[in-house]
Amino acid sequence: LSINQKSTEKNQKIIRDFLYKQISENKQSNILFDRSVIDNYIYSLALYDKGEASLEFLNETFDLVMRHLDFLDGVILIPTAASIKLVSDNLRDVDVNYIDKINRYFIKTLLLINKTRPLAVFVISVSREERIKLAGDIHRYMNYKMRL
């Protein structure tokens, strides 16, 4: 599937439906997902802004984001390009302007979500080794918080 700037509404729908199904059907605890329907909404919003996705699709995706929150205890945001060296690997986008736009969309969307639905958001912008350690610390914190 084409992703990032090369994605399409059709591809975003396939990805969105897969992500939603993956998290909503998983009954285990203590799981970290590296992508969520929130990610999908952000990339769909970027497509919408370019006129390449419909408002109907965007609204449908946001509705799924809000339902998706029932399955999340928190979100870890790792802004790309802030601490992660951009490498052209044919998977990730390396266009700094696009990445900055995506990072801004994430921040705006997470703030919007938090106005109506409190969600723990952790921003990690450090080296890979430190990200792994901090993710473990966040995991322990979330487990502690759930026991209270």
Predicted regions and their residues:
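Residues that form generic nucleotide/phosphate-binding pockets
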Residues: F18, L64, H68, T109, ...
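Loop/turn-to-beta-strand initiation segments
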Residues: K27-I31, D73
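Short low-complexity stretches enriched in small and charged residues
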Residues: L1-S2, N30-V37
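ATP-dependent NMP and nucleoside kinases share a basic, alpha-helical "lid"
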Residues: I23, S36-Y105
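Conserved substrate/cofactor phosphate-moiety recognition/catalytic segment
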Residues: L1-S24
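NTP-dependent small-molecule kinase module
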Residues: L91-L148
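Exposed alpha-helical structural elements
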Residues: K10, I14, F57-E60, L64, ...
